[in-house]
């Protein structure tokens, strides 16, 4: 579980619409363990402070930032009976302030431009992380050490009640999604009652209600000591500097009591069991789960290879059988979820409408038996190896965040006692044979699965939301092991914490790779930013099309046609395309946004030539075969049906036509998926016409970032695109009309029975992304609802505790763009929450205007985040894409700092008045109308209508 969800805000250039035993105190260990697999290595230095805190340091000086990743070796698996959800609740409390720095934890980090800031809890660990400018490292370490060593005096009943409410709404939000209750059911039936993994991390409402301040103190004292903690610093730092700073800030924190370490217990089952769950879903889903070898076990990487062969994509056994051949399901996947005590091997299949799930299970059983008998082929294994290697290499570009190098090192150290343990898994994957994978599969996957079938609830029937009964207590649980006795001692601190958080007055400058331009021999313009940190090249072909090009056509044409590109060329079918992509380690994808359609390539430098040949064939020569069209059509219709069971999907489908009118280019479902009627009527002529009119060289810009040069990439692109000629017919001109804004508020209610939360979405029209005062509009939005400490979020989440989060955001657009507010709130506070949204909207342009302090906060946050915002090749490509789409100059990013600094209060206030229209909002509220309709009507927000998920007014 993460502390808060990623913001829905559009970034610049993007479009929005997700144990070692204690070593000697002075010893430092530099990268031991096996030789790098295929050259993959994350060099590190490890040392232990006298108080037992483990430190791992990795140097990466490509950007002036340092990732700080702190892992406490405690998670939901350590919760005693009656305390489920407490580890995650405590994670939230860690953001409530500390004894020497009261108030929300985020403010100092926002002021220095921190990125990738969050906290998460899982079965075996709780982690907190952020990436900060190098000059702000002292501030970050002071903050982390203050809450680690000085928390309890800052946590009272108010803080506990606030975060309890936030967590309970996080639980409601998760359960308010289709299939949102499956994890709880699967865990309860996969593991015995005395297994640490039998309950999910979010916990039960009753246990969360029962959490007390005494529990907080006990948990902190038991688990948040220095000797139970690993800190990884990765980025622009040296081991010497890291040691000095960690000793300064953390050296006086007590080691804490020894923590009994739970031992691996797979609890594999001997017999197959079944369960059924009814939910508000559009189609039946079959989930099968096996308990398998834990992280670090020699079989775990082999099972990942087996999962890829069985259900890793279009080339996999089950996809071939169930989707292509028998046409029984719309999708099927298989994955391993690795954990410290046991892993889960999970199959998920979404059954086609009208198909008997029994037939699906029979086909799965046949493929399963065949795999257990024969194992994978040599080619299946090679494809899996390449995919694994390429994916790992791509992850090495980022120092922090959810999955960067700091996370790899921390996970290896915390779970396996060695920061380089990941190399063992890479080596096992490289050394695997069909025989070893088959043997591992037979050891773990031949018996003992739990099958959960999730079926659509009948209309008018209530779902059973009672907690699953689950398995009883079982024998065989290994005893916990105490760590080796160690003589830890905290040092006397010389740090005066009463002086407050260290001030940061110096900040690094932005370094953005130069944008180089070229032209292919047929006139196609290319833009390149070189980035040689990893051997990867990313590319985007940007076509002026998008959802807006559906105007006058069947809705969903652009998205559907783009989705068909990699389903077959004149010489290759979809399986062969997928097979070649896997062997090359390449990722090719195509899709549409509001104003553009694109085809993207992420390729290894060593395989770029062959990857480009495949890429060009997909773009230039789509086959649009009837069989592929029908297969994708079935999946597409299933996706639309799923959208109409999801609160967010319902709102994003219905709001745009209300804002723009249903004849406008933007008056369409913002999911881009169209309607059932339009998708059913699409034929090959429609798709070929779209491709002929929009996917053409005179409507194209090629954008590249990564490990290449302008001369080299121009030569390679000329080879595959240089002879591409446009037809004589001109590119159609999209008509994006200006819309008169509504003059009064309107409210549209959509019924979703049994919903534990209501989704409140408001919309109004704002100026185009291309307007001169876009920066002022974005600053205003950051203050109102676009950051964690924004007015909306602090009100509904931190003050009222009615929502897991509340935000406002602008959907980037060439024409007028929608300005939206979003909050998913507990059902019994729907009307009150809507009133608060309206109050905040009125206040920011009325009696509580934007302050100098708020402006300074957003300015500082955005300016100081710039140096760390372009660490990855993908983020650089995002700027090239945004520049091309919105006609920005090449130095757009380099001049952002000056333009941000130059904003005036008057201009930002004017932006607020131009965008925020509290008394002319269009409200879409999705929830249980039996409970919310009367209170919402009583608010008198505006004219109230009830409509269905298709936007049809019912009354």
List each language-model region with its residue ranges.
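Non-catalytic, conformational "gating/processing" segments within enzyme and secreted inhibitor domains
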Residues: 157, 164, 217-249, 449, ...
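Proteolytic maturation boundary segments
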Residues: 10-56, 238-278, 284-285, 289, ...
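Bacterial N-terminal signal peptides
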Residues: 1-8
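Short, conserved secondary-structure transition motifs
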Residues: 166-174, 265-277, 385-396, 603, ...
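A common structural junction motif
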Residues: 145-155, 249-257, 365-376, 617-624, ...
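Metal-associated gating/positioning segment near the N- to mid-region
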Residues: 93-100, 104
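M16 family metallopeptidases and their MPP-like homologs
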Residues: 56-58, 63-81, 85-89, 103-150, ...
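Alpha-helical scaffold elements lining the catalytic groove of polysaccharide deacetylases
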Residues: 207-216, 679-682, 687
């Amino acid at each position: 579980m993460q502390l808060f969800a990623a913001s829905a805000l559009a970034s610049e250039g993007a479009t929005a619409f997700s144990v070692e035993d204690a070593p000697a105190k002075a010893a430092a260990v530099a990268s031991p363990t096996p030789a790098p697999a295929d050259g993959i290595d994350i060099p590190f230095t490890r040392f232990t402070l006298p108080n037992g805190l483990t430190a791992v340091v990795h140097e990466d000086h490509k950007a002036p930032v340092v990732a700080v990743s702190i892992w406490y070796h405690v998670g939901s698996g350590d919760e005693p009976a009656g305390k489920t959800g407490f580890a995650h609740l405590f994670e939230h409390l860690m953001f409530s302030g500390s004894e020497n720095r009261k108030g929300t934890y985020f403010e100092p980090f926002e002021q220095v431009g921190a990125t990738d800031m969050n906290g998460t809890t899982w079965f075996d660990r709780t982690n907190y992380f952020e990436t900060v400018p190098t000059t702000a490292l002292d501030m970050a370490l002071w903050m982390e050490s203050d809450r680690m060593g000085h928390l309890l005096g800052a946590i009272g009943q108010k803080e506990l009640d606030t975060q309890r409410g936030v967590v309970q709404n996080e639980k409601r939000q998760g359960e308010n999604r289709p299939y949102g209750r499956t994890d709880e059911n699967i865990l309860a039936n996969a593991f015995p009652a005395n297994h640490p993994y039998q309950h999910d991390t979010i916990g039960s409402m009753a246990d969360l209600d029962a959490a007390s301040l005494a529990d907080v103190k006990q948990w902190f004292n038991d688990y948040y000591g220095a000797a139970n903690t690993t800190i990884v610093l990765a980025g622009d730092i040296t081991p010497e500097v890291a040691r000095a700073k960690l000793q300064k800030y953390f050296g006086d924190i007590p080691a804490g009591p020894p923590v009994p370490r739970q031992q691996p217990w797979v609890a594999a089952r001997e017999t197959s069991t079944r369960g059924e769950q009814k939910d508000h879903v559009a189609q039946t889903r079959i989930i099968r789960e096996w308990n398998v070898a834990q992280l670090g076990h020699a079989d775990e990487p082999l099972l990942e290879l087996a999962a890829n062969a069985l259900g890793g994509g279009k080339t996999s056994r089950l996809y071939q059988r169930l989707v292509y051949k028998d046409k029984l399901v719309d999708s099927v996947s298989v994955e391993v979820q690795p954990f410290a005590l046991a892993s889960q091997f999970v199959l998920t299949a979404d059954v086609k409408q009208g198909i008997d799930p029994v037939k699906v299970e029979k086909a799965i059983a046949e493929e399963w038996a065949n795999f257990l008998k024969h194992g994978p082929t040599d080619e299946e294994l090679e494809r899996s190896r390449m995919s694994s290697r390429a994916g790992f290499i791509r992850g090495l570009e980022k120092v922090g965040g959810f999955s960067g190098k700091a996370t790899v090192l921390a996970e290896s150290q915390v779970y396996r006692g060695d920061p380089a343990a990941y190399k063992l898994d890479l080596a096992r994957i490289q050394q695997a044979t069909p025989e070893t994978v088959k043997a591992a599969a037979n050891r773990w996957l031949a018996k003992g699965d739990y099958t959960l079938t999730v079926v659509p609830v009948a209309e008018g029937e209530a779902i059973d939301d009672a907690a699953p009964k689950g398995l009883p207590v079982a024998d065989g649980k290994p005893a916990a092991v105490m760590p080796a006795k160690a003589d830890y001692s905290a040092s006397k601190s010389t740090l005066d914490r009463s002086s407050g958080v260290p001030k940061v007055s110096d900040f690094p400058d932005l370094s953005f790779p130069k944008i180089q331009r070229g032209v292919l021999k047929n006139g196609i313009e290319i833009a390149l930013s070189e980035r040689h940190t990893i051997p990867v090249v990313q590319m985007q072909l940007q076509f002026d099309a998008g959802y807006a090009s559906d105007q006058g056509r069947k809705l969903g044409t652009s998205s559907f046609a783009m989705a068909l590109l990699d389903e077959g060329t004149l010489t290759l079918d979809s399986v062969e395309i997928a097979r070649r992509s896997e062997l090359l380690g390449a990722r090719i994808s195509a899709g549409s946004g509001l104003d553009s359609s694109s085809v993207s390539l992420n390729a290894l430098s060593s395989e770029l030539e062959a990857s480009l040949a495949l890429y060009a064939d997909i773009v230039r020569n789509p086959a649009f075969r009837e069989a592929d069209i029908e297969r994708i059509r079935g999946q597409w219709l299933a996706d639309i049906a799923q959208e109409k069971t999801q609160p967010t999907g319902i709102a994003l489908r219905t709001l745009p036509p209300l804002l723009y009118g249903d004849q406008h280019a933007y008056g369409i479902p913002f999911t881009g998926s169209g309607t059932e009627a339009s998708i059913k009527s699409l034929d090959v002529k429609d798709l070929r016409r779209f491709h002929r009119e929009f996917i053409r060289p005179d409507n194209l810009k090629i954008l590249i970032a990564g490990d290449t040069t302008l001369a080299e990439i121009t030569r390679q692109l000329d080879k595959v695109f240089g002879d591409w000629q446009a037809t004589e017919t001109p590119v159609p001109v999209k008509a994006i009309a200006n819309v008169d804004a509504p003059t009064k508020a309107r409210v549209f209610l959509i019924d979703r029975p049994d919903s534990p939360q209501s989704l409140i979405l408001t919309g109004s029209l704002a100026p185009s992304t291309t307007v001169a005062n876009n920066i002022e509009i974005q600053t205003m939005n950051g203050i109102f609802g676009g950051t964690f400490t924004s007015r909306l979020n602090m009100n509904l989440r931190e003050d009222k505790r009615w929502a897991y989060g509340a935000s406002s955001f602008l959907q980037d657009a060439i024409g007028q763009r929608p300005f939206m507010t979003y909050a998913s709130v507990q059902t019994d506070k729907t009307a009150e929450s809507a009133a608060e949204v309206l109050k905040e909207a009125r206040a920011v342009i009325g009696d509580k205007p934007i302050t100098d302090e708020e402006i300074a906060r957003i300015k500082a946050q955005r300016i100081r985040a710039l140096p760390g915002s372009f660490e990855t090749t993908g983020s650089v490509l995002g700027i090239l894409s945004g520049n091309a789409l919105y006609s920005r100059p090449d130095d757009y990013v380099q001049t952002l700092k000056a333009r941000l600094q130059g904003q005036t209060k008057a201009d930002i206030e004017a932006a607020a008045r131009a965008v925020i229209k509290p008394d002319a909002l269009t409200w879409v509220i999705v929830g249980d109308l039996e409970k919310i309709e009367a209170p919402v009507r009583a608010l008198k927000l505006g004219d109230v209508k009830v409509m269905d998920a298709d936007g049809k007014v019912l009354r």
